[in-house]
Amino acid sequence: HCYEKETVHSEKEQDSRLAAWPLLVADENPIEDLMETYRMMFPGKKVTPCIFPWIEPENKIVELNRYVLDCAEKHNIPALLLALPHWSAEELEARLIERKFNGIKVYLSFAPSYLPRDEVRIYDFLPPSQLEVLNRLGLAVMLHIPRSGRLKDPVNLGQILEIEQNYPNLKLILAHVGRAYCEEDVGDAFEILKKTERLTFDFSANTNAKVFEWAINAVGPQRMIFGSDLPITRMRMRRITENGKYLNLVPKGLYGDVSDDPSMREIEGEEADRLSFFIYEEIKSIREAAINTRLNKGEIEDLFFNNAHRMLGLS
């Protein structure tokens, strides 16, 4: 995510269908901060980010996208357009072609506000008319799937399979390994999705090595891509799971009062002192999954760079 403070600030209350804790990390992440974060966290490594806006506020979508495009052109890096479902096919195509985006980012909070969280379907914020445009242009869509059932939800699985079958030329990426942060989020999803030929998962903001292992075994390392989800993964935290739910362990007081957030738990003392960055926890879990699935050096290079480079049309 790449955004300026004055653009994302809004008096409007956050959509209740969204997790609240990611907003605790940074109220701004301009391109300069993003590039410096990569330089500091990955010394000696060349990182090519694919940038897109923060997902709110909706009434500043034009400014959010314009800033990202300006940054992408200045730094010669790929970018995704934050797209709204009410845009016509013609409007979406014009924005994509004129401004040279590599695809779109869509989000469940753009579904009609009258729909409760568990009644939102993928097509409510990624309509078929827009899928047809992406298919015709051969572009990518970064999809954060809805519903509390996450990856195992049968409605989600049904629509993912429909998209795979009906739009063979677009590049569908399921963010956060389909939001399967816990093993209980998976169900029989990978048994179903291993029949797909193009569907891709990204690892971003997920630290479940077992889920990563299942995903790699289901679709292969050529359909997995590394993502940072910065600035969210700049958090000092470690994720655990309890009773089928994820919990973010953070140093007491570092992110203000988190007592009312069921996804957060504060810790103190030596345990808190040992906490690293969320992004390092993600990479540690990728490493564990890579060892357990016996990936070779070339396959690891693919999932950290080559696969995304190819999918975004950069190779």
Regions found by a protein language model. Give the residues of each.
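Active-site neighborhood of phospho(di)ester-bond hydrolases with catalytic His/Asp-centered motifs
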Residues: H1, C50-F52, L80-L82, K105, ...
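An N-terminally biased module of ancient metal coordination in phosphate/nucleic-acid-related enzymes
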Residues: H1-W54, N59
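Active-site environment of divalent metal-dependent phosphoester hydrolases
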Residues: Y3-E6, E56-N59, H86-A89, F110-S113, ...
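Short, flexible/disordered intra-domain loops and linkers
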Residues: T7-L24, S113-R121, L151-K152, E183-E184, ...
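Proline-centered flexible-loop/turn and helix-kink motifs
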Residues: P43, E73, P168-N169, K194-E197, ...
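Active-site gating/metal-coordination segments in enzymes
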Residues: T48, E56-G149, K195-T200
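Distinct, well-ordered alpha-helical segments
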Residues: I61-L69, A89-I97, R150-N166, Y181-L193, ...
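H/E-rich (His + Asp/Glu) clusters that bind or coordinate divalent metals
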Residues: V177-S315
